[in-house]
């Protein structure tokens, strides 16, 4: 690519919605995608999930992004072109792109199928790709990525309700598998019942795990038990309920994306077990050491999942009919959707109908 102009490197005209500054407000945006390389898959985007991370990123709350920024970590569509050396898929296949579009391929994490922990991981938006240009996410008409980071989307899964699996799904599936919280008969606590939390309940039940949902309010009790199949519900602000649940859980998956007290949660764990934080937040938690030490309990965290885990998760979801509960929205509703996400006013995930509602900018 050396010596080539940006237009030569990225000859394919594309469009989407982008944030231009830390207000996070999105508006129509024209840009370009690279030509399809030998190992690339070009994707016509039909649906894109919207997550709390998109809101944080659009506002650059993590302090690591540049503008303009096209969000979208949960992308589903149709393969429209494949490179000459692509072996996993063909034109016309249903495919998906998740959190990553690249990594170094050489570090310990990459060679051991843990690309999401590569120090040079390239996320689907807001990062610099191997050719030195910015990556743009799924709030757009099309994308192109190396086949390693493009997944076969099972025919059995509905595309709209399946889109959130690409981030929210793998973000709960991966820690359950890695930390052994997927064993039938185990008792798992799920903190928070949002985009990640409701999928955590669904995956856990499919694994044969007993699930207790933990929330700050009783409002979601009916949804948790009657709609999602949870076995029990605890209100974390109710001291009597928390005391009754003391020492009953084999593990906790905490999906809340903001800072909150974790000491009360540690009391729910059996000795020698884990609290796993998966809610993306830039804040710092107060970690009480004594409650950990006396029960040899531990606190861990994960981010996303590997490419192998993502494909495995999609196939498992198809086998067990696991999809997200979604509200499908048009592209021009995205700023209202972001406001509602901030207010926790969604059950449980917004998905943009990109294929039918995204139109090219007028100028």
Swiss-Prot record:
GO terms for biological process: alkaloid metabolic process. It is found in: Cytoplasm. GO terms for molecular function: oxidoreductase activity, acting on the CH-OH group of donors, NAD or NADP as acceptor. It is an enzyme of class 1 (oxidoreductase). It catalyses: 17-O-acetylnorajmaline + NADP(+) = (2R)-1,2-dihydrovomilenine + NADPH + 2 H(+); (20S)-19,20-dihydrovomilenine + NADP(+) = vomilenine + NADPH + H(+). Keywords: Alkaloid metabolism, Cytoplasm, Metal-binding, NADP, Oxidoreductase, Zinc. InterPro entries: ADH-like_C, ADH-like_N, CAD-like, GroES-like_sf, NAD(P)-bd_dom_sf, PKS_ER. Homodimer. Alcohol dehydrogenase involved in the biosynthesis of ajmaline-type monoterpenoid indole alkaloids (MIAs) natural products, important plant-derived pharmaceuticals used in the therapy of heart disorders. Catalyzes the conversion of 1,2-dihydrovomilenine to 17-O-acetylnorajmaline, an intermediate chemical in the biosynthesis of ajmaline. Also able, with a lower efficiency, to convert vomilenine into 19,20-dihydrovomilenine. PANTHER family: ALDEHYDE REDUCTASE. This is 1,2-Dihydrovomilenine reductase. The gene is DHVR.
């Amino acid at each position: 690519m050396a010596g080539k102009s940006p237009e030569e490197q990225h000859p394919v005209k594309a469009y989407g919605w982008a944030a231009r500054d830390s207000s996070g407000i999105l508006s129509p945006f024209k840009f370009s995608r690279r030509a399809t390389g030998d190992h690339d898959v070009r994707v016509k985007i039909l649906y894109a999930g919207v997550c709390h991370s998109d809101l944080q990123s659009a506002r650059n709350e993590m302090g690591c992004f540049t503008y303009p920024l096209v969000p979208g970590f949960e992308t589903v569509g149709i393969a429209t072109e494949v490179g000459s050396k692509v072996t996993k898929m063909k034109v016309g296949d249903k495919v998906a792109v998740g959190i990553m579009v690249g990594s170094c391929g050489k570090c310990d994490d990459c060679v051991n199928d843990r690309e999401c922990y590569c120090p040079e991981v390239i996320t689907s938006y807001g990062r610099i790709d191997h050719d030195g240009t910015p990556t743009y996410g799924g709030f757009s008409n099309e994308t192109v990525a190396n086949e390693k980071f493009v997944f076969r989307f099972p025919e059995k899964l509905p595309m709209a309700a399946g889109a959130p699996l690409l981030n929210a799904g793998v973000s709960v599936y991966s820690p359950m598998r890695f930390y052994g919280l997927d064993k039938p008969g185990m008792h798992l606590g799920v903190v928070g019942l949002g985009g990640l939390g409701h999928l955590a309940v669904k995956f856990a039940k499919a694994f044969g795990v007993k699930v207790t949902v933990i929330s700050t309010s009783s409002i979601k009790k009916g949804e948790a038990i009657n709609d999602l199949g949870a076995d029990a519900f605890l209100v974390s602000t109710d001291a009597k309920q928390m005391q009754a649940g003391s020492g009953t859980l084999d593990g906790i998956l905490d999906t809340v994306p903001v800072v909150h007290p974790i000491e009360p949660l540690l009391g729910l764990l059996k000795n020698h077990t884990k609290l796993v934080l998966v809610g993306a937040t830039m804040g710092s938690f107060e970690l009480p050491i004594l409650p950990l030490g006396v029960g040899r309990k531990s606190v861990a965290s994960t981010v996303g999942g590997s490419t192998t885990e993502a494909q495995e998760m999609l196939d498992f979801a198809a086998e067990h009919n696991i999809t997200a509960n979604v509200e499908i929205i048009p592209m021009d509703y995205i700023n209202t959707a972001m406001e509602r996400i901030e207010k926790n006013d969604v059950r449980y995930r917004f998905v943009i109908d990109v294929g039918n509602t995204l139109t090219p900018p007028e100028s």
